[in-house]
Curated annotation (Swiss-Prot):
Family assignment from sequence similarity: Belongs to the FAD-dependent oxidoreductase family.
Pfam families on file: MDHAR3-like_C (PF21791), Pyr_redox_2 (PF07992)
Source species of the chain: Oryza sativa subsp. japonica
Positions of L-ascorbate binding: 320, 351
Lineage: Eukaryota, Viridiplantae, Streptophyta, Embryophyta, Tracheophyta
Gene3D superfamilies to which the protein is assigned, alphabetical: 3.30.390.30, FAD/NAD(P)-binding domain
SUPFAM superfamilies: FAD/NAD(P)-binding domain, FAD/NAD-linked reductases, dimerisation (C-terminal) domain
Gene Ontology MF terms: monodehydroascorbate reductase (NADH) activity; mRNA binding; nucleotide binding; oxidoreductase activity, acting on NAD(P)H
Protein name in UniProt: Monodehydroascorbate reductase 3, cytosolic
Keyword Lipid metabolism: no
Record keywords, A-Z: Cytoplasm, FAD, Flavoprotein, NAD, NADP, Nucleotide-binding, Oxidoreductase, Redox-active center
Length: 435
């Protein structure tokens, strides 16, 4: 008979959100044995962004236990011992294959069952694989993805095995840009391929993208736009040797890294909870349509108060904050204390080579570009504002200081009126500093 365990609270998923939720439970007061984290990964929760950045450095690379949560936000590092000391059970390397919300039961791949009173769904996303589309040769060796530490270890091993070789990066989003830089720093010959007219099209304007594309080109990264990978060639050992593109060209490759997005992991809950916009629908406290079941991070579609609409956000900042909000709401319900509704200011950032940008707010409306966006400058510093209905709704800054980044965040939060767009262009960062 497979084992059954009961907990008052269960967090399903072992990523960033799980770690920040555990810290909030400890802060609010949780008794030993009340809380469990069930994760299919073999390690305690860690800061996932390190995998596409410091983990791949050729020197002084980041390794666990160095980047367990909550170091990414300047907090204490929660090692496995921390969970034991708090009486929080870490149930690792455990895949849940069935969730029955009516009977409050989770079943693992080996038939173990876990029952709970309150569930936090923090399952995150899975990477979209080219094999999902039946791309020919997509299961060849050294075609890699990046989501978990295991994936990063495979990539590091491939980087070492194929030293100085040719890398093709499929995808022009965050992962594409960060990994192209990482492979270049590791002395690979790097080509980036994506179907859109410019990189990071969901956020960047053509002007912003032009800077990064030129900067990368100057660093020796080749960029192929407007086409996709339709197949891969492999040698007798099954190792990838080339990428065939839809435009007819063929790129030699020793390593291929694919970053074409993720899918929220909601399958276990299909038909049991209300869904919207590809995620599990929640209220401002991250409670779902099923009382006592909460969803946080990538999987949650929640009311974004600032813009008065339901949104789903895939970003580490929201994973941290939504997890904390859900725990505050759970504990608030128990103690009868009211909790403030989640009021999230969208925030995205990235770092690659010597660059680092931040974006706050909403990228809708007309845009202006200000500052020095010359990719050959020693220290480029430039930004953009998004203006709609006479107000600034979004702000982007490359190369900003901590104070300057705070200033653009304040602009996005307060949405100041703009009388004259030409004036705003001239003022640039000064406009933000005055708010």
């Amino acid at each position: 008979m497979a084992s059954e365990k009961h907990f008052k609270y269960v967090i399903l998923g072992g990523g960033v959100a799980a770690g920040y939720a555990a810290r909030e439970f400890a802060k609010q007061g949780v008794k030993p044995g009340e809380l469990a984290i069930i994760s299919k990964e073999a390690v305690a929760p860690y800061e996932r962004p390190a995998l596409s950045k410091g983990y791949l450095f050729p020197q002084n690379a980041a390794r666990l236990p160095g980047f367990h949560v909550c170091v990414g936000s300047g907090g204490e590092r929660l090692l496995p011992e921390w969970y034991s000391e708090k009486g929080i059970e870490l149930i690792l390397s455990t895949e849940i294959v069935k969730a029955d919300l009516a009977s409050k039961t989770l079943t693992s791949a080996v038939g173990a069952t876990f029952t709970y009173e309150i569930l936090i769904i923090a399952t995150g996303s899975s990477v979209i694989k080219l094999s999902d589309f039946g791309t020919q040769g997509a299961d060849s060796n050294n075609i890699l993805y990046l989501r978990e530490v295991d994936d990063a270890d495979k990539l590091v091993a491939a980087i070492q095995a194929k030293k100085g070789g040719k890398a093709v990066i499929v995808g022009g989003g965050y992962i594409g840009l960060e990994l192209s830089a990482a492979l270049k720093i590791n002395d690979f010959d790097v080509t980036m391929v994506f179907p859109e007219p410019w990189c990071m099209p969901r956020l960047f304007t053509a002007d912003i993208a032009a800077f990064y594309e030129s900067y990368y080109t100057n660093k020796g990264v080749k960029i192929v736009k407007g086409t996709v990978a339709v197949g891969f060639d492999a040698d007798a050992n099954g190792d990838v040797t080339a990428v065939n593109l839809k435009n007819g060209s063929v790129l030699e490759a020793d390593i291929v890294v694919v970053g074409v997005g993720g899918r929220p992991l909601t399958t276990l809950f299909k038909g049991q909870v209300a869904e919207e916009k590809g995620g599990i629908k929640t209220d401002a406290f991250f409670e779902t349509s099923v009382p006592g079941v909460y969803a946080v991070g990538d999987v949650a579609t929640f009311p974004m108060k600032m813009y008065n609409e339901l949104r789903r956000v895939e970003h580490v900042d929201h994973a941290r904050k939504s997890a904390e909000q859900a725990v505050k709401a759970i504990k608030g319900k128990e103690s009868g204390e009211s909790v403030v509704e989640y009021d999230y200011l969208p925030y995205f950032y990235s770092r690659s080579f010597d660059l680092g940008w931040q974006f706050y707010g909403d990228n809708v409306g007309d845009t202006i570009l200000f500052g020095d966006s010359d990719p050959t400058s020693a220290k480029p510093k430039f930004g953009s504002y998004w203006i709609k209905d006479g107000k600034v709704l979004g702000a982007f800054l490359e190369g900003g200081s901590p104070d300057e980044n705070k200033a653009i965040a304040k602009v996005a939060k307060t949405q100041p009126p703009v009388a004259n767009i030409e004036e705003l262009k001239k003022e640039g960062l000064q406009f933000a500093s005055k708010i």
